[in-house]
Amino acid sequence: MKLLPLLFVILIVCAILPDEASCDQSELERKEENFKDESREIVKRSCKKECSGSRRTKKCMQKCNREHGHGR
């Protein structure tokens, strides 16, 4: 009978704490999002270079982004 409260506490703690798989999944999602953000930034910088000077128009930037797969 003395073990019953201890088992109950362990059960509650296990239910509250996230399991290892969900932690790994969250970390993977964060890494994937960071990769997407970095990729967008790289494309944005290269398009700014490509569309620099007098060619730097909204149309040029949109075309460049579409060609690199980041068009909206």
Curated annotation (Swiss-Prot):
GO molecular function: acetylcholine receptor inhibitor activity; potassium channel regulator activity; toxin activity
Disulfide bond positions: 47-64, 51-60
Tissue: Expressed by the venom gland.
Consequence of changing residue 46 to A: Slight increase in inhibitory potency towards Kv1.1/KCNA1
Similarity section: Belongs to the short scorpion toxin superfamily. Potassium channel inhibitor kappa-KTx family. Kappa-KTx 5 subfamily.
Propeptide residues, chain positions: 24-43
Modified residues (Histidine amide): 70
Protein known as: Potassium channel toxin kappa-KTx 5.1
CC per GO annotation: extracellular region; host cell postsynaptic membrane
Function of the protein: Weak blocker of potassium channels Kv1.1/KCNA1 (IC(50)=578.5 nM-9.9 uM) and Kv1.6/KCNA6 (~60% block at 30 uM of toxin). Acts by binding to the pore and occluding it. Has a voltage-dependent mode of action, which can be explained by a high content of basic residues causing repulsions at higher membrane voltages. Shows a weak interaction with muscle-type nicotinic acetylcholine receptors (nAChR), since it inhibits alpha-bungarotoxin binding to muscle-type nAChR from T.californica (IC(50)=1.4 uM). This suggests it probably weakly inhibits muscle nAChR.
